[in-house]
């Protein structure tokens, strides 16, 4: 595959430039985005969180065939607790191939890129949780602290924190020590597989900025490697903090390799999907050995977190029988079918301690899957959902005992009045491990608009304490999302996450809102566009009726025209009020000076005049 065959979107967003903030060592260079505003406006550039990696830096030459820079490689090796090894051989079944079939897509050249898998040395635990518990502040933790702060120290004086955080512990300033302490408590995770050195460190936790995840992936009937890599780049361009590859078709291994090697954000997967492909889609033929081999395969590639549906227990399955929509999780339904076919307990549950040891060797995080999440608002908060959540709490403590990082997945479809209870129960049962929810959708009547029905719930659950929101696209329940659906989903969820941060009173969250509001009131149209979550869409909507460049200077838009613009009228009222205030002040001075039309010149002034010649 070459850059000519794989079209990747590059270049900065409108009005923006990439900057880097250096930490305590030269190789800790934290990428951010600065939005420059109109010269002469008196406005400083607005600094915003950036997930786009080298793709928006014009000074970087990205070669997809070699992957993006390995930012963390030296940090990982210098700790001395991992070792290179040969790794498992790439097998035809990894890509869904039958014996004798050849792969039909390009394969990333790992050997040419100098890549060999890493794993823990015997007796070592190379996880961010283990380091945090030992009191070690890693370069990754320092990177995260700088990234979360941006210009917080300068901004906090200008913005009052007036939100409701429901018992969170959001600091005025994020320090590396605070990051370490939150990870050590299990309240935050820093997804960072030792085999994904390309990923820029980020953190997920309720005391940090609310994050979003974008799902991509092929299916048995649609998409290609090219499309999925571009979807990843596209998703991070618009603000995805992590990306999950949910591929279910052929060439899963090859597609994932291209994605990971070129991803600046953590990558998650659901390993049971690939394991199922290896047994021709027959859930009853799954075995622990096949699943374990799949975990190793993906950990060696560099997957940062796995969704593991270990909470779908045999005793919970009958609780779903009277549901409106049964079991809607793909992973949950696969494991439920296996349990019923064998009348045995879920092998992900019975082998959980072994999974912990395996994940610890690579610092792969757990995303404990909600296989029994409600798929309709009629099923929200039922016994099956909360029974599984209780088991996830049990498994969280087991994973922590192995120094594994954990996040907890949540619903789903939940009406607004039932959302808060989900967060409260998750915090109670799972020891404040970060919550990661799919929406939730607050109504079931809007196919084609489920990015909106879910963003309503996402904003609410984020406010209540969910740490990461999994996006929903307009194609949810209808089909595989394309590139534009990904953009729509990401931007919609950035909006929901930001709304949650505002409501929580997150320091500095309102700076961008205030800057855009001032630009709007002052008719600085380009600043409005550039400060928005989707500058290109904002510009396109404006230019639909007023495309001329001069319209970017006009004090009106096509909605109200020049005579009915409320902001223009408001400015005129303000100017009139200022003039009236000035007149009132002059009137008061006139009265205070004696209300005389003509004033007699003071005697001292007359004496000071020179005599006439």
Curated annotation (Swiss-Prot):
Recorded GO CC terms: cytosol
Cofactor(s), names only, from the UniProt record: [4Fe-4S] cluster
EC number: 4.1.99.17
One Pfam match: ThiC_Rad_SAM
SUBUNIT field: Homodimer.
Residues where Zn(2+) binds: 413, 477
Keyword Transport: no
Catalytic activity: 5-amino-1-(5-phospho-beta-D-ribosyl)imidazole + S-adenosyl-L-methionine = 4-amino-2-methyl-5-(phosphooxymethyl)pyrimidine + CO + 5'-deoxyadenosine + formate + L-methionine + 3 H(+)
Reported function: Catalyzes the synthesis of the hydroxymethylpyrimidine phosphate (HMP-P) moiety of thiamine from aminoimidazole ribotide (AIR) in a radical S-adenosyl-L-methionine (SAM)-dependent reaction.
Gene3D superfamilies per record: 6.10.250.620, Radical SAM ThiC family, central domain
Binding site for [4Fe-4S] cluster: 557, 560, 565
Annotated pathway: Cofactor biosynthesis; thiamine diphosphate biosynthesis
The organism of origin for this protein: Paramagnetospirillum magneticum (strain ATCC 700264 / AMB-1) (Magnetospirillum magneticum)
Protein name, per record: Phosphomethylpyrimidine synthase
UniProt cross-references to InterPro entries, sorted A to Z: ThiC (IPR037509), ThiC-associated_dom (IPR025747), ThiC/Bza_core_dom (IPR038521), ThiC/BzaA/B (IPR002817)
PANTHER family (alphabetical): PHOSPHOMETHYLPYRIMIDINE SYNTHASE, CHLOROPLASTIC, THIAMINE BIOSYNTHESIS PROTEIN THIC
Keyword Heme assigned: no
Binding, substrate: 215, 244, 273, 309, 329-331, 370-373, 409, 436
Keywords assigned by UniProt, alphabetized: 4Fe-4S, Iron, Iron-sulfur, Lyase, Metal-binding, S-adenosyl-L-methionine, Thiamine biosynthesis, Zinc
Entry's family note: Belongs to the ThiC family.
